[in-house]
């Protein structure tokens, strides 16, 4: 019955590479493709599919691979850009408490006062106009941290 095999002159599928080593055909996921043998049913008509897991199989911890939230091995959290900016902004509560009172040896604490500008007619105009320059310099120093 050997003469009945390949009766339509279909090209033979070689199971070896160019050096004669045996090879296995695999699908796009790397799973081996079973060879077709006679005597088996067609899949879907009484056949059984012995497939494996076609998705990604992950092992290890479920934590993110990004280590940006923790410092290198110390266990302390790194400060994000938001926290660094809060420290640098002049209107910050901590910044105000540091800037309002200073001590000089022998003189006691000195307190800084906000100066108000007066208009030419003698009336109080309020605080000086706001300038964005200190905020911009704080942002640049925080980003280049």
Swiss-Prot record:
Residues 1-136 are annotated as: Disordered. The lineage of its organism: Eukaryota, Viridiplantae, Streptophyta, Embryophyta, Tracheophyta. PROSITE patterns: DEHYDRIN_1, DEHYDRIN_2. LEA protein are late embryogenesis abundant in higher plant seed embryos. There are two subsets of LEA proteins (5a, and 5b), the first ones are expressed when the cotyledon weight reach 80 mg and the second set are expressed above 100 mg. The function of those proteins is not known. GO terms for molecular function: metal ion binding. It comes from Gossypium hirsutum (Upland cotton). Residues 47-57 have a biased composition (Basic residues). Pfam families: Dehydrin. Residues 82-96 have a biased composition (Basic and acidic residues). Keywords: Repeat. InterPro entries: Dehydrin (IPR000167), Dehydrin_CS (IPR030513). GO terms for biological process: cold acclimation; response to abscisic acid; response to water deprivation. Residues 58-68 have a biased composition (Low complexity). This is Late embryogenesis abundant protein D-11. Belongs to the plant dehydrin family. This is a SET 5b protein.
């Amino acid at each position: 019955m050997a003469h009945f095999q390949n009766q339509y002159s279909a090209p033979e599928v070689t199971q070896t590479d160019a050096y004669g080593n045996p090879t296995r055909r695999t699908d796009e996921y790397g799973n081996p493709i079973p060879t077709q043998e006679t005597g088996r049913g067609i899949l879907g008509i009484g056949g059984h599919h012995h497939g494996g897991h076609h998705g990604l199989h992950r092992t290890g911890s479920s934590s993110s691979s990004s280590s940006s939230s923790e410092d290198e091995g110390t266990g302390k959290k790194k400060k994000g850009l938001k926290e660094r900016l809060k420290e640098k902004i002049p209107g910050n509560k901590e910044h105000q408490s540091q800037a309002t009172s200073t001590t000089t040896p022998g003189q006691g604490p000195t307190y800084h006062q906000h100066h108000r500008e007066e208009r030419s007619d003698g009336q109080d105009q309020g605080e000086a106009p706001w300038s964005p320059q200190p905020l911009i310099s704080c942002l640049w120093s925080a980003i280049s941290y």
